[in-house]
């Protein structure tokens, strides 16, 4: 499960980079009048969704790490 969380986190990091790049392109096109307001909002929403997914993946990964530390009895070392 931990490996899956790490893979997902890495994928979401890549997705966030792509979403940021797409958002920048959309902003430039919008300022040039080559993109509608609705399309700009869609690009903004895609970026927000990517940010939300990465936060969720980071949380899930950290919770998995903490669970493993609890199971292994090393949680007190982690908390120091």
Where are each of the predicted segments found?
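Terminal intrinsically disordered/low-complexity segments used for targeting and assembly
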Residues: 69-80
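Amphipathic alpha-helical coiled-coil segments
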Residues: 1-53, 60-71
């Amino acid at each position: 499960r931990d490996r899956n969380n790490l893979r997902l986190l890495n994928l979401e990091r890549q997705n966030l980079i792509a979403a940021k790049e797409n958002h920048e392109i959309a902003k430039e096109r919008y300022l040039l009048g080559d993109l509608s307001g609705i399309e700009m909002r869609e690009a903004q929403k895609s970026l927000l969704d990517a940010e939300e997914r990465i936060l969720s993946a980071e949380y899930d990964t950290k919770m998995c790490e903490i669970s493993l530390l609890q199971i292994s009895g090393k949680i007190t070392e982690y908390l120091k």
